[in-house]
């Protein structure tokens, strides 16, 4: 605990909060163009082919984004909307592509958690 005199001489340091998604530059989402769409394998205990895309954002950053859901229609030069949110078993993937926005189609035949995958309500 500092004395009053110590605080007069040197003020307390401000705590700087470091962003977990710096490429979005204080925005909730960012538009971008896919430069490469490919699959990659996850870290040690898991095994799969995870679909990811390299995206050039309007902020000027180039980031690797995860494509959630089963199947997708993305290819090079597709316009996508990117949000924050990392994928724990893919190192370097700190962003998600939003399904059902811009050029990204929603997940087909999805019944539950539809809003997260951009799927319209099925005609009952």
From Swiss-Prot:
Keywords: Methylation, Ribonucleoprotein, Ribosomal protein, RNA-binding, rRNA-binding, tRNA-binding. GO terms for cellular component: small ribosomal subunit. InterPro entries: NA-bd_OB-fold, Ribosomal_uS12, Ribosomal_uS12_bac. The modification 3-methylthioaspartic acid is found at residue 89. Pfam families: Ribosom_S12_S23. GO terms for biological process: translation. GO terms for molecular function: rRNA binding; structural constituent of ribosome; tRNA binding. With S4 and S5 plays an important role in translational accuracy. Belongs to the universal ribosomal protein uS12 family. Part of the 30S ribosomal subunit. Contacts proteins S8 and S17. May interact with IF1 in the 30S initiation complex. This is Small ribosomal subunit protein uS12. It comes from Nitratiruptor sp. (strain SB155-2).
């Amino acid at each position: 605990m500092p004395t009053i005199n110590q605080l007069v001489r040197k003020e307390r340091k401000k705590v700087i909060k470091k962003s977990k998604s710096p490429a979005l530059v204080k925005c909730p989402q960012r538009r971008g163009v896919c430069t490469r769409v490919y699959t990659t394998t996850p870290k040690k205990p898991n095994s799969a082919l995870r679909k990811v895309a390299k995206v050039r954002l309007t902020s000027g950053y180039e980031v690797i984004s995860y494509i959630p859901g089963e199947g997708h229609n993305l290819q090079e030069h597709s316009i996508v909307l990117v949000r924050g949110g990392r994928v724990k078993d893919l190192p370097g993937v700190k962003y998600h592509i939003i399904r059902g926005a811009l050029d990204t189609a929603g997940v087909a035949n999805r019944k539950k958690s539809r809003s997260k995958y951009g799927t319209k309500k099925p005609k009952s």
